[in-house]
Amino acid sequence: RPFLYFWEGAEPNSGLAPERYHVDGVYPQNDANVVTSGGSGFGIMAILAGIDRGYVTREEGLARMERIVSFLEKADRFHGAYPHWWYGDTGKVKPFGQKDNGGDLVETAFLIQGLLAVHQYYINGNEKEKALAARIDQIWKDVDWNWYRNGDQNVLYWHWSPTYGWEMDFPIHGYNECMIMYILAAASPTHGVPAAVYHDGWAQNGAIVSPHKVEGIELHLRYQGTEAGPLFWAQYSFLGLDPVGLKDEYCPSYFHEMRNLTLVNRAYCIRNPKHYKGFGPDCWGLTASYSVDGYAAHSPNEQDDKGVISP
């Protein structure tokens, strides 16, 4: 099903993932052609899995990837970073908010993560596949991670706008879904940031460490604004980054930390303090999705639990 959503449900011109899909074809906000950068990074990886499993031929898969990369080469970018949304028919930025009409470094990281997976899949292939890998390599090298330090500060900022500059004013600290952004920024062969950006910005010189228990399960890190975040905080950064054996001076095992964060989510749903029908050991998972109140980052706490189990 994830493969079919991204394969059959793609916006026709760009080949990218739609921001939302309405089965009835009715779009009250007239946004049927709006595509998302980060979500497309996830979709690209799903398509790769589909190619590898024979859901489509290798030639069909390559053609889709070529369409996607051709769109990305021409679509609006801001110091190499992509916006959260575009109009899929034109490649022009669709503002995510009043002042959010420029680069979104977090969503860009999710997209680059997917593109790098494609790069590795094709780098030793035939001539057409190698050519596509080279084009992806250039997109990766074009992202100016250093620009998003807002004047060489030792932290990365989420947004920059050609109209409003840094007015969104959102420096990113951990832990949340953004770890992959800091990893890619440090790894960039052309615009790599110094290690101090990770240590001072992401880890806040050790303030990210905050051992505690939630639902009786041990967590080692501080989670921004909550004791334990939504499920996607344990997922997005590790689609392309293997947590097994991964550690640093702030976390002795990212695999065990993310496993425990996931188990907190399950334990909360089993306890089900708001008594939702259906919640239990085989029906759980609070993460970002639609709800009766629109989009919400559903989390394992009573304030952010709206009774939505996201498929």
Language model: regions and residue ranges:
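Ser/Thr/Asn(+Pro)-rich, low-complexity disordered segments
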Residues: 1-311
